[in-house]
Amino acid sequence: MRGAQEPMLDPFKMPGWLSLAIFSLGFLSVIWAIMRHLSLRPSNDRSWVNDNERQAEAEFNGDEVTIRNVRDFEWRSGRDFDERWIDLKLNLTEVEKIWFVLEYFDPRRRQMAHTIMSFEMSDGTRLACSIEVRRERGERYHPIKGLFRQYELIYVWATERDVIGVRTRCRKRSVTHLFEAVVLGPGNERRMLESYLMRTNKLGESPEWYNTITNTCTTNIVRHVNEVYPGRVPRALAILLPGLSPKILQRNNLVRMNGTIEETLQRSIIDERAKSWSGDSDFGDWIREHAQYEHSTE
């Protein structure tokens, strides 16, 4: 004769009060988590990694602007570098060209990429701005975490030998392209630079959360472009996945093309050229020397 078995608890036949209690507890837990998430506030006062430690600031004086805390590191590897910060004075009437940088982190994953804008003055001075996650010490970036108020946003103003150099000379997998932008048309380059600088100052006063979908390098570039030239960049998946941007760049005539899109992509790769730079010449001139931008067509 088998021993009597204790009846199993059927969750669908629990007393009404118990079901209600479990549901209420779960509901309140979700509400608490949402409220806690929404209560998080971004800050400019944390223990930042060295290359994100200082935040740039622009001081306007008529047509002149002084940009403080421009990064000018000398990178030997991603962890070995000489730290240097400089102030740079520019004349806003002398903005001559804008350059667009597209860095694929891994060529096998073409959706994921980083975008940078670089401003060239009539005297050849170039200053780049990389819109990034502002990392704390010991912190690593992950796109999923970027959805949940885990990183602040920063506009990193830097020399090209720093912000482009570290990508082309120190990263083994990444592939970096350099295009001359024609996104705004003549005369609007100054307004684009001013838009960037004013947003930089705003972030210094009111920090913001980075968001993997809504507040990234590329979504901010598009906002700046459309602020200066409304409707210039249409809505597209490539804004969320910047690695897909070459076709939208071609379709909307946003960069100078040198042949077909495939030929332009191949000719715009600057990694090997950057690796051969000896340091005796200007880095920006060196990576552009064989690009033939002046012979390209829109």
For the regions a language model picked out, list residue spans one by one:
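Glycine-rich catalytic cores of cysteine/serine-nucleophile enzymes that process amide/ester linkages
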Residues: V65, R76-T176
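A structural motif
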Residues: E160-T200
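Alpha-helical transmembrane signal-anchor/signal-peptide segments
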Residues: L40-E57
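A short, structured loop/turn motif at beta-sheet edges
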Residues: F60-E64, E120-G124, L184-E189
